[in-house]
């Protein structure tokens, strides 16, 4: 069954018979000299290959530098060093090694694969951060600032209202303090006026202190017999009455004494003028009648009984004296405010300004971390090129060393081999059976084939989280913007504080006390009218909404990521084309191996497929959920997915499908698969009766290299 490859043609003949579609197209579209150069043998055109390869490699290195290194935040000297290094390595590699050229071109299909998606994923995350995330951060910071401004506005309004309400009281005290000197002058005048009365009350003129003590002791003795001992102290009233009585006694005594002196003086004068001895004593005898002076004692009794002192004089004097002494003190007034701060949670005592500052600092720190992470992401994106380059070299090495690696393509050379065998009358493979078509890939088909579909679906599912992240962030950004914009339009508040008062105290009269009261209580005569207007317009949030262009900028990388998932199958086909272009002999060996391997499997097709057929038949015979039967009967659109399938190729059952007639079998086959099974059901046919082969199921089958 093996086919041996004979290399017995000339170089010109090989050029006239291209084995690949790319070779056929380039031979048709390029001049003959270019075709000779592209499909030259090793050692041909060395100088031309070196110069053209070095130029192409240098240009490719410059392009990679502009794409990867230039956006990095590094010094210009380092960028220049990277540029020279990349250009030198690119020129040397492209000029001397076909492996370097192949690996470099493999970067294009690799960028369409999972490595390229990783690169685009970084840009998608950066676009999401610059778009919805940055706008969310801006709006949240704006709301935090709005809350702080609102609280500060409330505090300022409360403080202003308090100051306005207490302004009249503070103005009154200020007026009192400003009239302090005038009040002092008035009090000095009052004190000077009171000094005359005080001197008169405290004066000891008109009596002797000894008389006071004697009279006091006499009065105390007399009152001691009438009152308890605790009341022996004389009050101001009694002391003044006592002094008045003593003055009366003193005046009467002085009058009696003066009267007696007058009699003595007249007696002496009489004795001097009359010299007759007997006649002198007789005529001067009346001058000895001093006892007539005692008549003045009658006045003393009258004075004691009718003292000209009011009954409440002492109490009035004491009160007035105390008031006058109080006026001599310092006049001052102080306004003290006591502020009580209550501790917050767990005994903390933190002001709103500090909390707002801490929150703002926390937001700034998070922004700095995000900026640092974004810079690191840019560096990692540049470093992902190394992963892409490594994947390119890895594919090239696996292509050259593992003949089964990614060897599932039905190429032009495969068809040429089949045509040649058909002309020779040998067994051929084309057209492939349905079950075989699901294990290989036709590179020229513009659709995604069965071998590629599972990998594409898996990559699309891996893209789903980043897509959901974008949708959630955009939805959250739009929702928050709508909420904040509604708050801004419907939360306008106008603060209005009005205060007015009028206090008037009238003090009539022109006395000293009236003037004093007018200067003190008159300070209460104040009036004020205050209007304070304020609003919260400066504190309302000012959210920013993303426009359609911003949403597109965030969604385009995600869309590109989805497109890369769909283009991955075609990119993987392209990498095989590039490797076959640089290693045509290796490609021929791989195609020959694939053809021989499919021939062997075709010979043992029934036996190799028997295990899978039995498994699928058991799954079909298993009882289905009643809901599946209901949907199958009631929903025609779902019948294609709920109906039975061919146990070989898994095609949906049709009216033309063949159902095994063996009892308890009922395996479903499409007619082409039934013919491939040689019209014998592997389910109900013993294994020994099937076509024998030395080959069985193996894990060494060629597989799709994802």
From Swiss-Prot:
Residues glycosylated per entry = 156, 189, 321, 349, 525
What's in the GO CC field?
acrosomal membrane; plasma membrane
Identify the stretch(es) annotated as Disordered: 1-20, 204-230
For this protein, the record's InterPro entries field holds: CSR-E3_Ligase_Protein, DC_STAMP-like, Znf_RING
Q: What is one Gene Ontology biological process annotated in the Swiss-Prot or TrEMBL record?
A: negative regulation of type I interferon-mediated signaling pathway
Q: Which GO terms describe its molecular function?
A: ubiquitin protein ligase activity; zinc ion binding
Q: What induces it?
A: Induced by IFNB1.
Report what the protein is called: E3 ubiquitin-protein ligase DCST1
Source species of the chain: Homo sapiens (Human)
**Quick one: which gene encodes this?**
DCST1
């Amino acid at each position: 069954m093996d086919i041996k490859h004979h290399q017995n043609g000339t170089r010109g003949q090989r050029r006239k018979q291209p084995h690949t579609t790319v070779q056929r197209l380039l031979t048709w579209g390029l001049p003959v000299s270019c075709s000779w150069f592209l499909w030259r043998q090793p050692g041909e055109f060395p100088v031309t290959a070196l110069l053209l390869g070095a130029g192409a490699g240098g240009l490719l290195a410059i392009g990679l530098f502009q794409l990867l290194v230039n956006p990095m935040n590094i010094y210009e000297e380092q960028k220049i060093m990277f540029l020279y290094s990349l250009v030198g390595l690119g020129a040397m590699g492209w000029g001397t090694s076909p492996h370097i050229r192949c690996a470099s071109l493999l970067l294009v299909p690799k960028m369409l694969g999972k490595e390229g998606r990783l690169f685009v994923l970084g840009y998608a995350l950066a676009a999401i951060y610059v778009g919805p995330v940055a706008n969310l951060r801006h709006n949240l910071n704006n709301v935090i600032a709005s809350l702080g401004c609102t609280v500060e506005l409330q505090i300022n309004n409360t403080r202003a209202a308090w100051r306005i309400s207490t302004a009249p009281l503070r103005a009154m005290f200020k007026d009192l303090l400003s009239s302090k000197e005038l009040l002092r002058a008035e009090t000095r005048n009052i004190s000077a006026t009171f000094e005359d009365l005080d001197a008169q009350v405290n004066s000891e003129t008109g009596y002797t202190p000894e008389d006071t003590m004697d009279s006091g002791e006499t009065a105390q003795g007399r009152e001691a017999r009438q009152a308890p001992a605790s009341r022996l102290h004389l009050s101001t009233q009694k002391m003044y009455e006592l002094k008045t009585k003593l003055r009366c006694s003193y005046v009467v005594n002085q009058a009696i004494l003066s009267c007696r002196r007058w009699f003595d003086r007249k007696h002496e004068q009489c004795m001097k003028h009359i010299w007759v001895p007997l006649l002198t004593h007789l005529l001067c005898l009346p001058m000895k009648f001093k006892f007539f002076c005692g008549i003045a004692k009658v006045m003393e009794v009258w004075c004691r009984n009718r003292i000209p002192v009011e009954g409440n004089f002492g109490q009035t004097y004491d009160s007035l004296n105390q008031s006058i002494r109080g006026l001599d003190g310092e006049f001052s007034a102080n306004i003290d405010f006591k502020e009580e701060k209550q501790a917050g949670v767990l005994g903390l005592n933190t002001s709103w300004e500090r909390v707002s500052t801490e929150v703002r600092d926390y937001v700034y720190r998070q922004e700095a971390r995000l900026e640092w992470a974004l810079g690191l992401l840019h560096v990692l994106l540049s470093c992902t090129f190394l992963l892409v380059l490594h994947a390119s070299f890895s594919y090239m090495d696996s292509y050259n060393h593992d003949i089964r690696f990614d060897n599932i393509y039905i190429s032009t050379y495969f068809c040429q081999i089949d045509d040649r065998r058909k002309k020779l009358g040998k067994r051929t493979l084309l057209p492939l059976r349905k079950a075989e078509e699901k294990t290989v890939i036709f590179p020229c088909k513009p659709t995604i084939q069965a071998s590629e579909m599972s990998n594409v679906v898996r990559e699309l599912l891996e893209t789903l989280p980043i897509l959901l992240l974008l949708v959630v962030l955009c939805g959250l950004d739009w929702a928050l913007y709508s909420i904040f914009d509604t708050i801004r339009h419907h939360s306008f508040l106008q603060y209005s504080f009005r205060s007015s008062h009028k206090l008037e105290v009238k003090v009539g009269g022109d006395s000293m006390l009236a003037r004093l009261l007018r200067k003190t209580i008159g300070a209460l005569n104040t009036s004020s009218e205050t209007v304070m207007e304020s609003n919260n317009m400066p504190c309302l949030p000012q959210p920013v909404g993303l426009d359609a262009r911003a949403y597109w900028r965030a969604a385009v990388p995600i869309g590109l990521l989805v497109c890369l998932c769909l283009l991955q199958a075609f990119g993987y086909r392209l990498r095989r084309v590039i490797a076959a272009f640089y290693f045509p002999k290796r490609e021929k060996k791989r195609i020959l191996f694939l053809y021989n391997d499919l021939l062997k499997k075709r010979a043992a097709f029934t036996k190799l497929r028997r295990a899978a057929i039995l498994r699928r038949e058991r799954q079909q015979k298993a009882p289905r959920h009643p809901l599946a039967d209901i949907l199958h009967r009631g929903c025609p659109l779902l019948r294609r997915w709920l109906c039975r399938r061919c146990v070989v190729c898994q095609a949906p059952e049709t009216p033309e499908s063949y159902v095994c007639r063996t009892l308890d079998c009922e395996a479903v086959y499409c007619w082409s698969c039934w013919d491939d099974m040689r019209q014998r059901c592997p389910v109900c046919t013993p294994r020994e009766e099937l076509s024998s082969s030395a080959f069985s199921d193996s894990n060494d089958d060629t597989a799709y290299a994802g």
